[in-house]
Amino acid sequence: MGLPGGWELVLIVGVLVLLFGATKLPQMARSLGQSARVFKAEARGMKEDEEAAKREKQAKSEPQQLTAGESSAPTVASPVEETQRNDSKK
């Protein structure tokens, strides 16, 4: 039992026209299309939120992955060391 064929589709459309009337069918189709667009937009929004949460989680975990030889803050030479280096070059 597969998909309905040509005559079966005509019969289904005829029954729909009799049940709902010719004026209601375009309105129902339009409403169905709008609902599908809203559903797609919400699904896309949820996917983007999920990806943003993953990126945020990765950003938080990256600074914690330092090796033993690395330090988290850059080191700055004190002014005393700089003057001693300059004096020794002269």
From Swiss-Prot:
Keywords: Cell membrane, Membrane, Protein transport, Translocation, Transmembrane, Transmembrane helix, Transport. Residues 42-60 have a biased composition (Basic and acidic residues). It is a single-pass membrane protein. The keyword Transmembrane helix applies. GO terms for cellular component: TAT protein transport complex. The chain crosses the membrane at residues 1-21. It comes from the Bacteria. GO terms for biological process: protein transport by the Tat complex. GO terms for molecular function: protein transmembrane transporter activity. It is found in: Cell membrane. HAMAP family: TatA_E. Part of the twin-arginine translocation (Tat) system that transports large folded proteins containing a characteristic twin-arginine motif in their signal peptide across membranes. TatA could form the protein-conducting channel of the Tat system. NCBIfam families: PRK00575.1 (NF001854). The Tat system comprises two distinct complexes: a TatABC complex, containing multiple copies of TatA, TatB and TatC subunits, and a separate TatA complex, containing only TatA subunits. Substrates initially bind to the TatABC complex, which probably triggers association of the separate TatA complex to form the active translocon. This is Sec-independent protein translocase protein TatA. It comes from Saccharopolyspora erythraea (strain ATCC 11635 / DSM 40517 / JCM 4748 / NBRC 13426 / NCIMB 8594 / NRRL 2338).
